[in-house]
Amino acid sequence: YSERLAEIGQRLGPFDVAALPIGAYAPRWFMQEQHMDPQQSVALYRELNQPRAIPIHWGVFELADESLDEPPQQLNLALSEAGLEQHQFLPLKIGERIALQGSSPALPNHPAAQRDE
């Protein structure tokens, strides 16, 4: 996690949906430089002006010390502590799919996506 991640939203937003990592975070002393925890995902969600969010990077492989089902539980706790409703995050089961509709411009045509030359 880095506060600079909010710059993505400022340059390319607003977003309808954000894929935010919530897993592979324990132990924090070791994983904090590479992986966001659920609390940090909630913080980034707020910095991105609260789009719909799909939690990613959890529940498939045991990559860290937390159990496979802990990240969504910690996410719900983090949302509750932040005073946010849980329905804005859509944790999907393995193989589950959803259809989303939105209004953000297509990335290749978005002016902020153009490379600086």
Predicted regions and their residues:
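Cap/insert and terminal regions of metallo-dependent hydrolase folds
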Residues: 2-92
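Core dinuclear metal-dependent hydrolase active-site scaffold
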Residues: 1-13, 77, 93-117
